C-alpha cells in the first residue's frame, strides 16, 4: 500500500562492498571449478579452468577472441604458446583478485605476456617497476625492450639515463653488445651528454675493438655520423693497410687521431640539460620557479610553489620530477612533513605523501629510483632519523639512523653511496660536525669514512668524474675528495663566499648559484662556473634575483 504524498520519494541504495564481494565470489567459483566455461593451456601442458566473462572483462585480447568471428570463440580449450605457466597463473589470479606480484625475476616475462594478452593495467605496472629500477647498467637493454613493447614512459626514462650518463653507460658490458643501428641511434641524439672530443670518440673505439673483424667496416660510418672532421682518404687507406693486422684499441685510436684534420673544430656544445631554481630566501621565503639554459643564457619562469610560506626545505630531482620536502614556516619555525612534487614536463605541482618525520635544513638526494630525506632539524635540534620514498609503492620507508644527526649539512650520491658532509650537530646545533658519513643502501648501514679538512655548514656538494666536490660556505675554499684514494685536495678557490648556495653539474662543469656572503653582508645573485680542465672559476650569469637556501637541480632534456 503506497504512502500518501511520497510517490516520488526515491532511495538509491549502493552497496560499497558489492564489487569486492562480487570478485570474491568469482574467485571462489574459480578455485572450486564452478561455472567455468573455458580452459587455458600453457606449452608445458598445465591448464587453468576459467570464466570467459572474467577474462574478457580484464583483457581485450580475450574479449576479441570470445566475441569476434574467430575459431577460438567456439572452442572450450585455448592453447597459449610462449607463456610460462607461472606467468599465466599470475595473470589469471590477477583477473580474479586484482593483485599480482611483480619481481625483478618475473617482470620482463610478465610484461611480455601482459602486452600479448592485453592486460593493460598489469603491463603499466610492470613498466613502472622497470622505470623504478633503471640504472646505467641496464638502460640500453631497457630502451630496446621499451621500444619493442611500446612502453612510452620506460622508453623516455631509459633514454634520459642513456643520454645524461653516456660516459658511464658506454663503459658497461651491455654497451659492447649493441647493434650498429642502436649505436647510431644513440649517437644521433641531440641531447647526448658529451662535451669533449674524446668523450664521443672513445666509445666508438671501444665498441669497434670488441668485435673488430665484423665492426671495423662500420668505423668510418660511425665517425661520419658524429660529424668528426676526419680525412676520409687517409682513414680508408690506413684501414686497408691494417686489414691483415690485429687492430687493438690503441691502434684504432691512433688511426682515428691521425686522421683528424689539423684544423678540425671541437664538437659543438649541445643543450643537454636545464637548471631549475626552486624557491629560496631573500629576506622572506621565495616561491618562484626559474628555469635556465646555460648555452642560451635564457631564463623562463615556471609555476610557483603552492605552499609559498615555507623555507629551508630539501630539494632533489628524480627523472622529470622535482621533490620539495619538509621545511618550516617563518611564523612558528615548526618542522613540516609535507612534500610537493613539480613535474618539469607539465609545469604542474602536486602534493606528495607526507614524510614519516617532519624536518627542515635536511639533506635530500635520489638513489636507486627513490627519494631520500636525511637528518635535519626537528624541535630545534639535529635529528638522526633518515627515510626514503619509493614512488612505485607510494610510501616512505625508514632506514638506519645516521651516526650523527646533522642539520644544514650537504649530501650527494656517488657510485650508489650517499655521502653526508658537515653540518650542525649537538644540542640545538651548537657544534659543527667534521666527519663525512656514508650510507650503503644494500646493507642499510652508515659509516664514518673521513674528516672534512674545513668543517662547515651551509655547503654544497656535487659528484663529478668519480670524485666529490665541496663548494660554498663561509670561505672561498673548494675541495675535491677521492673516495677510492681517501684523499682530499684543494682546487682553485671560488670568486665569492657563498653560504647556502646551490650547485649542479652541467655540460662537464660545476655551476654554483646565489648564496649569502657574510663578508659582504649581502645575498648573491651571480652564477659561478668551474671548469675542471682549466681549474678555473668564472662568473657566467645571474639569477633572476639574489637568494640563498634555494633548490638547484639539473633536469636532462629528452
From Swiss-Prot:
The answer to whether the entry has keyword Repeat is yes
Q: Which Pfam families match?
A: BACK, BTB, Kelch_1, Kelch_KLHDC2_KLHL20_DRC7
Question: Which parts of the chain are Kelch repeats?
Answer: 274-320, 321-369, 370-416, 418-466, 467-508, 510-557
Which keywords describe this protein according to UniProt? Kelch repeat, Repeat
The answer to whether UniProt assigns keyword Transferase to this entry is no
**Species of origin:** Homo sapiens (Human)
Provide one Gene Ontology biological process annotation.
Answer: proteasome-mediated ubiquitin-dependent protein catabolic process
Tell me which domain of life the UniProt entry assigns to the organism this sequence originates from.
Eukaryota
Enumerate the InterPro entries for this protein: BACK, BTB-kelch_protein, BTB/POZ_dom, BTB_POZ_KLHL23, Kelch-typ_b-propeller, Kelch_1, KLHL23_BACK, SKP1/BTB/POZ_sf
Which molecular function term from Gene Ontology is one that the record holds?
ubiquitin-like ligase-substrate adaptor activity
Q: Which SMART domains match?
A: BACK, BTB, Kelch
Cellular component, GO, one term: cytoplasm
Xref: Gene3D superfamilies = 1.25.40.420, Kelch-type beta propeller, Potassium Channel Kv1.1, Chain A
Query: Could you tell me which residue ranges the BACK domain spans?
Result: 139-240
Q: State what protein this is by name.
A: Kelch-like protein 23
List each copy of the BTB domain by range.
36-104
